[in-house]
C-alpha cells in the first residue's frame, strides 16, 4: 500500500490496529481462563476491512 494515504483511511487503519489486540492477562486471570479470546480479533490476511 502506498505511503501517502487519505486521512480517513489512515484513521480507520489505526483504529483497526488498536482494536486488534489480545485480551489482557489480568482479564484472563480474573475470569480463571474462561475468557481467552475476543470475537473481534482479525487476521490481516484472512479478513479485509471495510472501505
Swiss-Prot record:
According to the UniProt entry, its GO molecular function terms are:
structural constituent of ribosome
GO terms (BP aspect)? translation
GO CC field = ribonucleoprotein complex; ribosome
Q: Which family does it belong to?
A: Belongs to the eukaryotic ribosomal protein eL39 family.
Q: Which UniProt keywords apply?
A: Ribonucleoprotein, Ribosomal protein
Alphabetized InterPro entries for the sequence: Ribosomal_eL39, Ribosomal_eL39_CS, Ribosomal_eL39_dom_sf
Family matches, as Pfam families:
Ribosomal_L39
Region annotation Disordered: where it falls in the sequence: 32-51
Protein's UniProt keywords contain Ribonucleoprotein: yes
Point to the regions of Basic residues compositional bias. Answer: 33-51
What is the name of this protein? Large ribosomal subunit protein eL39
Amino acid at each position: 500500500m502506498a505511503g501517502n494515504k487519505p486521512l480517513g483511511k489512515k484513521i480507520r487503519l489505526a483504529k483497526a490496529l488498536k482494536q486488534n489486540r489480545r485480551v489482557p492477562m489480568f482479564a484472563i486471570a480474573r475470569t480463571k481462563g474462561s475468557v481467552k479470546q475476543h470475537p473481534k480479533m482479525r487476521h490481516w490476511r484472512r479478513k479485509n476491512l471495510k472501505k
